[in-house]
Amino acid sequence: PDDNHRLDRYLEDIREVERRIQRIEARNASGEVRELPEAPAGVPDSFAEHVQLMFDIQALAFAADITRVFSFKMGRDGSSRTYPESGTDKPFHPASHHGGTQKGVKDFHLINRYHVAMLPYFLDKLKSIQEGDSNMLDKTMIVYGSPMSDSNLHNHRRCPLILLGKANGQLAGNTHLVAPDGTPMANAMLSMLHSLGVD
């Protein structure tokens, strides 16, 4: 009965993602001028809707053990996309080159905060998936980060990383680490692989 319930839930989750995609496609096919002319056909105008669909598909792939690794880039660094839901209408790339002005820094902060605010949706989704005696979030290691620490200067030193999930007990959580200056980000990636038993 437990396996049947799990399979039913998985299939219903797939059907729900399909229904949401169909609703989005119907809205986008209205002939209206799209907010994002460079967006590929079928991608929702709403950033949050797009990210949630991508997270749902990733969670489904994990639940079905189709993959154990994925990479997802939430946006292009050179994009002029705007995120009005963030509280600013400044495009992403121009906001990243804020010139150190108080307004510019605030706009870029609002956009980044908006992006990070998408993560709890994915975490909750993974936490809702039963995985053995625990849940998918407890069995997962998620790395979220930025390729720059100061995009205004194109500075690649001391780039921020957030680790989420428990990696099957390998991540303790509630820890803030500051690596010594000059430490390559590759060291963090290597430590993560070692914690998963990869040499």
Label the model's feature ranges.
Residues 1-199:
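Ligand-binding pockets and gating/stacking loops
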